Amino acid sequence: MLEKEGKLIMSREDEEIMAWFERTTRDAADVQRETLRRILAENAGVEYLRELGLAGLTDAGSFRARVPVVTHADLDPYIQRVADGDASPVLTAKPVTAISLSSGTTQGKRKRLLFNDDLLRSSIRFFHASYAFTNRAFPVEDGRVLQFMYGSRHETTKGGLTATTVMTNLLRSEEFTASMAARSRPRLPSCSPSEVVFSPDFDESLYCHLLCGLLLAGEVRAVSASFAHSIVVALQALERVWRELCADIRRGAASPARVTTPAVRRAVAPILAAPNPALADALERRCAALGDWSGVIPALWPNARYVQATMTGSMEHYVKKLRHYAGGVPLVSGNYASSEGVIGINAEQHAPPESVVFTVLPDAAYFEFIPLKPPCTDAAADDDNPAAAGSSCYVDADDANPVGLTDVVVGEHYEVVMTTFTGLYRYRLGDVVKVAGFHHATPKLRFVCRRSLILSINVDKNSEHDLQLAVDSAAKILAGDGENHKQLEIADYTSHADTSSDPGHYVVFWELNGGGEEDGGGVLQRCCDEMDRAFGADAGYAQSRKTCAIGALELRVLRRGAFQEVLRHYVAGGSSAGQFKMPRCVAPSNAGVLRVLKDNTINIFFSTAYDYD
């Protein structure tokens, strides 16, 4: 932003980005046709499309007639060949420069996806667009961002390609970092040097992010991370280690116990520079006065204008805690992207996280949308076919042929399908979205949930969203209980469909804040019963519980810090802490996480909601 006659005006870069956004969203149908034509023309000779008989055709009709809608499992053998060193044009004509890895939080196995220069440049423009909208909504002067960003370990595939998270692939790209640094105004570099981001030790990296953020507190204009969870984890750590951080600032040297990597110590030394007892004293007074740490962000970073991270989907649970930490500082939901590619931009950044919508970028990919039937819970259960009534998961509509980007209907639900420059052709993303409106000819999407069924024992079908509703319903009992003097609250949760015994049953794991871990036995039993009843909104579940085809729901209360152990388990396996999303259901194949959860269990409750005798 630039100053002119006392008013903030947009920089040249932001003006160009806004013009591009308006142009492409206005001409969305033409842009989509051209995007598909470019993808297919560029990749006309690749093996996958030749096998399907596309024969160089580039129109949407021929493409849809010959190329099937697929999942990752369908493309994985082709991707594996590329990773193993097959240099022929298997999925893309352009060279594959790296492999991107998903977080792998649900099944315990990380998906592999192709990364190339097209995705790099699309991501660069995506980030520039994000900055432009943020700068328009929250104009700031030059300063810094307290950015909780973490690189992940990389592996080398059999074919010699680097495999890591998509964000790490971007951060390791000289073109990406140079493009971000080349912005004119405002200049908002991270508080932390890159050595901190790429520290091999997550706890060391987190500690140094906090240390650098406190040392440069007056310059901080924003607090950000890829996901809300990362900011919450960081500020929870601050609650524990603020005295150590103040001691480091007082003596002008990082704790040798906390910061052990030589390159990281060298990188933060110039920021520490010299002992600063005055700053240490001021920080100690502010931290000591916080009490429950409400408003810690404006207390320690008074010039922060906003807090930005993805706050939709599985991140919704952390919004309440993040709002607690942020005080009056606005929460800004990040944009809509995935390991597969960029999708939409949050163009209405003043909207609260609970109502954020994303405007699809028509030239990021070729988009299709599978019509879905929303959950139906008002039908009566049929004793002979309980699964037919009240299914709480989204299913394909009767006429489920995918529709184009500009043909979606406001108010309807869809699953996103993408065709990209990185070798994904009619790829089911697995995301359920609701069309909230249009910006010119381009739809604005509200993220609803992941479509995947996460809890099922018999004929029951419960999704991630259903789990969230059940936990939220029980949390109201916890919050409103007159005996809950120590104000227990749910810090985090996950679930598991346990079929190791007959009948199988749902297990929900809670970590609690407030009071002692073993407090609240009476109210927690009621919470357990309430979750069991809430899942009964799915007629298949309710009928199965009544007939004992599904056993009593089990609530396991975990030791404080248990979910931090889950995070560390994934980081130790090569996942990035910055891209970590708590798995809302842990599959039986994810034995390592189940072991962490079971080892940290301190109390167990079984539902009595269906005990009638």
From Swiss-Prot:
Keyword Phosphoprotein assigned to the entry: answer is no
- Protein role: May catalyze the synthesis of indole-3-acetic acid (IAA)-amino acid conjugates, providing a mechanism for the plant to cope with the presence of excess auxin.
Q: What is its EC number?
A: 6.3.2.-
Name the Pfam families for this protein. GH3, GH3_C, GH3_M
Q: Which InterPro entries match?
A: GH3 (IPR004993), GH3_C (IPR055378), GH3_M (IPR055377)
- At the top of the EC hierarchy, this enzyme's class is ligase
Entry's Gene Ontology cellular component terms: cytoplasm
Tell me the gene name.
GH3.12
Q: Which organism is it from?
A: Oryza sativa subsp. japonica (Rice)
Q: Report, as the record phrases it, the tissue specificity of this protein.
A: Expressed in roots.
Q: Which UniProt keywords apply?
A: Ligase
Q: Does the keyword Ligase belong to this entry?
A: yes
What GO MF terms are annotated? acid-amino acid ligase activity
- Similarity comment: family membership: Belongs to the IAA-amido conjugating enzyme family.
Could you tell me what induces this protein? At very low level by auxin.
Looking at the record's lineage, which domain of life comes first? Answer: Eukaryota
Q: Which GO terms describe its biological process?
A: response to auxin; response to light stimulus
Provide the protein name: Probable indole-3-acetic acid-amido synthetase GH3.12
